[in-house]
Amino acid sequence: MLEWDLSALFHDKEALQNFTQDQIQQSLNFKKNYENKLYTLNTNEFLQALKDYENLNQALGKIMTYVYLLFAKNTQNGSFYAQYEEECKKIEENLLFFELEFCELTPEKSQEFTTFCKDYDFYLSNLLQNKRYNLSKNEERIMLYLSNTGANAFSRLFDESMSALKIPFEGKKLSEEEVLSKMYDEDRKIRKKAAKKFSKVLQKNSRLLSFIINMIKTERKNISLLRGYENAEISRHISNQISQKSVDSLIASAQKHFNLVSQFYKRKKQILGYDELKDYDRYAPIGKEASFDFKTSKNIVLEAFQAFSPQFYDIAKNAFDQGWIDVYPQENKQGGAFSHSATSDAHPFVLLNYTNKRRDLFTLAHELGHTIHQKLSYNVSYLNQNTPLTTAETASVFAEMLVFDFIKDKLKKEELLSLYANKIEDIFATFYRQINFTCFERRLHAQENELSTEEINKIWMEESQKMFQDSVKLTKNYASWWSYIPHFIHSPFYCYAYAYAQLLVLALYGLYKSKKCENFKELYIKMLSLGGSVSPKELVGMFGFDIEDKNFWEIGIKEIQKLINEFMELQSC
């Protein structure tokens, strides 16, 4: 199957409507039974209330998963999505009191409940740890109702606007995904032309896109002020369960080694025979670029996963066979790729925009890595499944490494050169580029006032050039390329999580290949199965690593240097 089968969630919209109305009533009953009464409950009664709360949250997740997936297939159908956002607000409002009232219990009572509810102790402890950022019940209610007219509304506007963009190219109207795939074309004229055409469309929409990112910035500033967050990014670190110190250390390590980016691209310029490497040359193919149709990629991924773990294979096989994956680009379909965790009574759903390129093979592996992680995390209860972004991206990048290792032994030298170059560029995109994005966001959100397009462009160019140093010439057209990146809109300060995951995976994968950890596979599957029920520090600690140690990041960076050295040796043979 090449398109989603959403019947695992709901058979039709009527079933969705009936389920939603039932859950609204259930949430009203929950509010009636427990609001202003938590302090009167004994431990068994509180555990039952907690499970009821969890079930209602899972129902919410199920409703919005179905609605969001329909929207992702056709982003012009925003009214249906908005309708159910409003319906779900009714449920959310009825549940709003629970976490707030738990945090207001006496320390003795909250500790008694936390100790008794062993399966939820990490979740409850986190609530207590961050309760200083809570507002009053009435204030939280106002925030809830305003949320769909704030950043969420601008996120939807961004999605609808970007998916509607058509880029004129050689007599055709291309989507964002289709024109960006031209950046990998071997013909420099095509790359240059595609970059110019895409830039022109972004520039044409710059007023709208600049306004959207300014509104995201303003709302984040206001929420930080209201909740008492120390800065615009701290709420992301809290949800990622990582310290500001650890994030700063990660960024400093990346910046310290920007020379690896420069080293690689200078060699690439030599290989291509160019006097100057431009921004549209970054992904120019080296050697023979292999093409992978979806069937070929499916078989490669399944074989690579099978070689690592039968569990990985079984989950991926089900994804291919049972309508978990929506494969090809379509008009009005959301761009990019994702794996949505959905709920444990269904299964994850993967969105692709597959165009038979080598990078599509690795995108497939990446998203199925998420799928495997999400499916394994169904082993813990719904409130414990919410994995921090830092560890959520680990499984996806690890899956890419499995596929890279699997196919590199099966390629000819010319294809191997291309594979190595592409893998290194993928690592740069996942590590260094995400640090570049985070530094761009830091500067953007540090500005008090609304920024003009020109001011945003300037910050973007300055931060981008730091990464490339003198190895890549950024043309003036590149100045607007911040404006199509969805993470800046949907999830501010998300991007460092990719960098974190990349270095963590390189450290883990190096440990796996070294065979120094005899039970690595069992430990790794256990780590994924724990979902968000323990901290990232504890998860990584299972392998003997300490993410708070600033030297930890150097382990992954050494693996990047090793890959670059292997590429250099291969190229000089």
Kindly give the residue locations of the regions a language model identified.
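Short pre-active-site segment immediately N-terminal to the catalytic Zn-binding motif
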Residues: 290-294, 345-365
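Active-site recognition of the HExxH zinc-binding catalytic motif
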Residues: 228, 355-375, 396, 401, ...
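Long, K/E/R/D-enriched contiguous segments that form extended
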Residues: 267, 271-307, 313, 317, ...
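Conserved binding/catalytic microenvironments
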Residues: 322, 352, 359-361, 367, ...
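A well-structured
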Residues: 1-287, 569-573
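C-terminal, non-catalytic "cap/extension" segments appended to globular domains
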Residues: 125-132, 270-277, 364, 372, ...
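Post-HExxH zinc-binding segment in Zn-dependent metallohydrolases
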Residues: 388-416, 423-425, 429, 501
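Catalytic zinc-binding patch centered on the HExxH motif and its immediate surroundings
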Residues: 290-292, 325-347
